[in-house]
Amino acid sequence: MKSSTFGMLALAAAAKLVSAHTTVHAVWINDVDQGEGNSQSGYIRSPPSNSPITDVTSKDMTCNVNNKATAKTLEVKAGDKITFEWHHDSRSESDDIIASSHNGPILVYMAPTEKGTAGNGWVKIAEDGYTDGTWAVETLIKNRGKHSVTVPDVAAGEYLFRPEIIALHEGNREGGAQFYMECVQVKVTSSGSKTLPEGVSIPGAYTATDKGILFNIYDSFDSYPIPGPAVWDGASGSSSSSSSSASASAPAPTSAAPAPSSFTTIAKQPATSSSTEAPSTENTPSETTSTTSAIVSTTAVASTTAPATPSTTSAIASSAAPTNSVPQPSSNAGGAVKEWYQCGGLNYSGSTQCEEGLTCKKWNPYYHQCVSA
């Protein structure tokens, strides 16, 4: 018993030191790469590091620790596909996206920019949890860090889109779940017919003891309760506060250009979108898939080797391409693994050889780590 308790405490302590975290680096619109967006000159409100938020009552749950307007805003229309691209260190092919041990759900919220910045008006528009034995994070890694949503048929204006990962590798204890999120600045240019629901407050939508947050992924289970409100069904009205099921499939809002929202791999394509000049203030903010009447579909598809053909050309409210000035931790993608980095475990595909003087310690079937010998 003592040995088991010590092992769990050691795992919890060591995991805090592991730079196996993740952030959103870029966004694609209708399969067109919008370029690196995680800097003050970009379109993502990015934190200075890829560390998680663990206190569900913190104001940092809204848009992470850097909830300030950035220089650019992406322009979209109802029915457009927005793809979020997550990475551990960089957009390089060798990047491991997020540690394979960090299993859990992926959710996407949206809110009007002014209300969302203040932590209010957040409406869940997509989610993926645990389906047929596969976690959403596992699908994300297979899809090279990409998952997508469809822009609802809402009124024109500026919005924040908030993709979120909840890593549950320490979810067996209260306060152990890790939350990764950023806010992407988006301007909807089409005039939609649907009224966005009132939404929920973030922080406020979760508690540390919610069934989908205080959750032991190492126990035997057949289903997983995704925390937070239900996915919006696309109709005008109020947002429900009830918990969602493991996966969602809801009617899509009517739009002139309906498109499915799916967690899918996107063929790489250079950023060739048009751009316009638009000042920013602190207070203002393909790969072809079959058409379906669903806000979210979590079926993974095989990656394509041919460049995708975008259905529309999106615009960024700036003429300059964003450059990344956000500090990032060093990568351990190739060669010997550095201290505190992952070196093995179920579904892990990276190097298993630790640097000299280190040994690959097995904490549990899902997570092995390089520590001092």
Curated annotation (Swiss-Prot):
PROSITE patterns: CBM1_1, CBM1_2. It is an enzyme of class 1 (oxidoreductase). Has a modular structure: an endo-beta-1,4-glucanase catalytic module at the N-terminus, a linker rich in serines and threonines, and a C-terminal carbohydrate-binding module (CBM). The CBM domain is essential for binding to and subsequent oxidative degradation of polysaccharide substrate. It is found in: Secreted. Residues 324-333 have a biased composition (Polar residues). It catalyses: [(1->4)-beta-D-glucosyl]n+m + reduced acceptor + O2 = 4-dehydro-beta-D-glucosyl-[(1->4)-beta-D-glucosyl]n-1 + [(1->4)-beta-D-glucosyl]m + acceptor + H2O. GO terms for biological process: cellulose catabolic process. Its EC number is 1.14.99.56. GO terms for cellular component: extracellular region. Disulfide bonds join C63-C183. SUPFAM superfamilies: Cellulose-binding domain. Lytic polysaccharide monooxygenase (LPMO) that depolymerizes crystalline and amorphous polysaccharides via the oxidation of scissile alpha- or beta-(1-4)-glycosidic bonds, yielding exclusively C4 oxidation products. Catalysis by LPMOs requires the reduction of the active-site copper from Cu(II) to Cu(I) by a reducing agent and H(2)O(2) or O(2) as a cosubstrate. In addition to cellulose, also cleaves the beta-(1!4)-glucan backbone of tamarind xyloglucan, but only next to unsubstituted glucosyl units. Residues 235-262, 270-323 have a biased composition (Low complexity). It comes from Aspergillus tamarii. Belongs to the polysaccharide monooxygenase AA9 family. Residues 36-55, 234-333 are annotated as: Disordered. This is AA9 family lytic polysaccharide monooxygenase A. Lignocellulose is the most abundant polymeric composite on Earth and is a recalcitrant but promising renewable substrate for industrial biotechnology applications. Together with cellobiose dehydrogenases (CDHs) an enzymatic system capable of oxidative cellulose cleavage is formed, which increases the efficiency of cellulases and put LPMOs at focus of biofuel research. GO terms for molecular function: cellulase activity; cellulose binding; metal ion binding; monooxygenase activity. It holds the Pfam family CBM_1. Keywords: Carbohydrate metabolism, Cellulose degradation, Copper, Disulfide bond, Glycoprotein, Metal-binding, Monooxygenase, Oxidoreductase, Polysaccharide degradation, Secreted, Signal. Its cofactor is Cu(2+). Residues 1-20 form the signal peptide. Induction: Expression is up-regulated on steam-exploded bagasse as carbon source compared to glucose.
